[in-house]
Design a protein with these regions (language model features):
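Conserved glycine-rich cofactor-binding loop
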Residues: 18-19
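Substrate-binding pocket helix/loop in short-chain dehydrogenase/reductase
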Residues: 95-96, 103-108, 205
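Alpha-helical segment proximal to the catalytic Tyr-Lys
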Residues: 124, 169-170, 233
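Short, small/polar-rich loop/turn modules that mediate ligand/substrate recognition or access, typified
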Residues: 172, 177, 235-237
Length: 249
């Protein structure tokens, strides 16, 4: 059956695939025929993700991408890729008067610097095909929306969003497309385990969404799949907002 979103035969690396959007993206990409390589810090979680994938031959690599050395170690283990989903991320909720150099460093290393360094190394080692697709998981916090105590996270994602456009421009001649998705709040463990948010807080926040609910990981994965697929072969330097209308307010 004809499917313009097929990923059949494509080899795709997904970072931050231990849970949440990364895990779900790996699952959905495997259903569409992709050969999946996932990476993250926790081997047990990566093994669990692999167990959910459709098809055979998928791989995982345990790694910490918060340093250039960690990125280099990963790249050395990789085959040539058709796609990269740069999804790994961390968040810290802090009012501005409590920022510290250590926290800034921790968040920016993972959310902004790691994607930049990983892509640099993939290019230098010729590990991305012509054509290929790179998708960055950013956030509406780094695109259109602000909230108290979320400045460090939002600033790191804003940096990633700006970088994506420069990468898209510079790499277009190599056949490498670069785009970003910007989710609003998504029902993942990060929400469920957030002790700073009470049930009343979540209900109140959900009312800010015109569609009156948070997103599901699959809804983000489907947009990522579009950008990875040949259906998006003329799309680069674009931002796709997936937020139930939250950024309309």
């Amino acid at each position: 059956m004809y499917n313009p979103f097929s990923l059949e035969g494509k080899t795709i690396l997904i970072t931050g695939a231990s849970s949440g959007i990364g895990r779900t993206t790996a699952i959905e990409c495997s259903k569409l025929g992709a050969n999946i390589i996932i990476t993250g810090r926790r081997e047990d979680a990566l093994v669990e993700t692999i167990s959910f994938l459709t098809g055979e031959g998928h791989e995982y690599v345990v790694g910490d991408l918060s340093s250039e050395g960690g990125c280099a170690s990963l790249v050395e283990k990789l085959p040539v890729l058709d796609g990269l989903v740069s999804n790994a991320g961390v968040g810290k909720m802090l009012p501005v008067q409590f920022y510290s150099e250590d926290v800034l460093d921790e968040v920016f290393k993972v959310n902004a610097f790691a994607p930049m360094l990983l892509l640099k190394l993939l290019i230098r080692k010729k590990k991305l095909k012509n054509p290929s697709s790179v998708v960055f998981t950013s956030s509406i916090s780094g695109y259109s929306n602000v909230a108290p105590a979320n400045g460090i996270y939002g600033a790191s994602k804003s940096a990633l969003t700006a970088y994506m456009k420069y990468a898209a421009l510079e790499l277009a001649g190599k056949g490498i497309r670069c785009n970003a998705v910007h989710p609003g709040r998504v029902n993942t463990a990060l929400i469920a385990n957030n002790r700073l948010l009470s049930e009343a807080d979540i209900t109140k926040d959900m009312e800010q969404y015109p569609l009156k609910r948070y997103g599901e990981p699959e809804e983000i994965a489907y947009a990522i799949i579009y950008l990875l697929s040949d259906a998006a072969s003329w799309v680069t330097g674009s931002n796709i907002v997936i937020d139930g209308g939250r950024s309309l307010k």
